[in-house]
Amino acid sequence: MVAYWRQAGLSYIRYSQICAKVVRDALKTEFKANAKKTSGNSVKIVKVKKE
Protein backbone atom coordinates (compact mmCIF):
# COMPACT_ATOMS: atom_id res chain seq x y z
CA MET A 1 0.00 0.00 0.00
CA VAL A 2 1.43 3.34 -1.07
CA ALA A 3 0.68 6.48 0.90
CA TYR A 4 -1.66 8.96 -0.77
CA TRP A 5 0.90 11.77 -0.65
CA ARG A 6 3.40 9.55 -2.44
CA GLN A 7 0.85 8.68 -5.15
CA ALA A 8 0.26 12.41 -5.66
CA GLY A 9 3.99 12.88 -6.26
CA LEU A 10 4.64 14.85 -3.07
CA SER A 11 7.43 14.49 -0.57
CA TYR A 12 6.42 13.96 3.04
CA ILE A 13 7.75 17.40 3.98
CA ARG A 14 5.60 19.12 1.33
CA TYR A 15 2.58 17.02 2.34
CA SER A 16 2.99 18.01 6.00
CA GLN A 17 3.34 21.69 5.02
CA ILE A 18 0.07 21.53 3.08
CA CYS A 19 -1.69 19.81 5.99
CA ALA A 20 -0.41 22.41 8.47
CA LYS A 21 -1.62 25.26 6.25
CA VAL A 22 -5.07 23.69 5.91
CA VAL A 23 -5.35 23.30 9.68
CA ARG A 24 -4.23 26.91 10.28
CA ASP A 25 -6.72 28.20 7.69
CA ALA A 26 -9.54 26.26 9.36
CA LEU A 27 -8.92 27.81 12.79
CA LYS A 28 -11.28 30.35 14.28
CA THR A 29 -10.15 33.97 14.05
CA GLU A 30 -9.08 34.29 17.69
CA PHE A 31 -6.67 31.35 17.35
CA LYS A 32 -5.18 32.29 13.96
CA ALA A 33 -2.80 34.94 15.32
CA ASN A 34 -1.14 32.48 17.69
CA ALA A 35 -0.92 29.81 14.99
CA LYS A 36 0.75 32.20 12.53
CA LYS A 37 3.24 33.27 15.18
CA THR A 38 4.31 29.68 15.85
CA SER A 39 4.27 28.56 12.21
CA GLY A 40 7.82 29.76 11.54
CA ASN A 41 10.93 27.65 11.54
CA SER A 42 11.16 25.30 14.48
CA VAL A 43 14.69 24.08 13.90
CA LYS A 44 17.69 25.79 15.42
CA ILE A 45 21.17 25.05 14.11
CA VAL A 46 24.06 25.49 16.51
CA LYS A 47 27.67 25.18 15.41
CA VAL A 48 29.88 23.46 17.95
CA LYS A 49 33.13 25.23 18.79
CA LYS A 50 36.14 22.95 18.58
CA GLU A 51 38.75 23.45 21.27
Swiss-Prot record:
The modification N6-acetyllysine is found at K21. GO terms for molecular function: hydrolase activity; proton-transporting ATP synthase activity, rotational mechanism. GO terms for cellular component: mitochondrial inner membrane; mitochondrion; proton-transporting ATP synthase complex. It is found in: Mitochondrion inner membrane. CDD domains: F1-ATPase_epsilon. The keyword Nucleus does not apply. Signal peptide: none annotated. Mitochondrial membrane ATP synthase (F(1)F(0) ATP synthase or Complex V) produces ATP from ADP in the presence of a proton gradient across the membrane which is generated by electron transport complexes of the respiratory chain. F-type ATPases consist of two structural domains, F(1) - containing the extramembraneous catalytic core, and F(0) - containing the membrane proton channel, linked together by a central stalk and a peripheral stalk. During catalysis, ATP synthesis in the catalytic domain of F(1) is coupled via a rotary mechanism of the central stalk subunits to proton translocation. F-type ATPases have 2 components, CF(1) - the catalytic core - and CF(0) - the membrane proton channel. CF(1) has five subunits: alpha(3), beta(3), gamma(1), delta(1), epsilon(1). CF(0) seems to have nine subunits: a, b, c, d, e, f, g, F6 and 8 (or A6L). This is ATP synthase subunit epsilon-like protein, mitochondrial. It comes from Homo sapiens (Human). The gene is ATP5F1EP2.
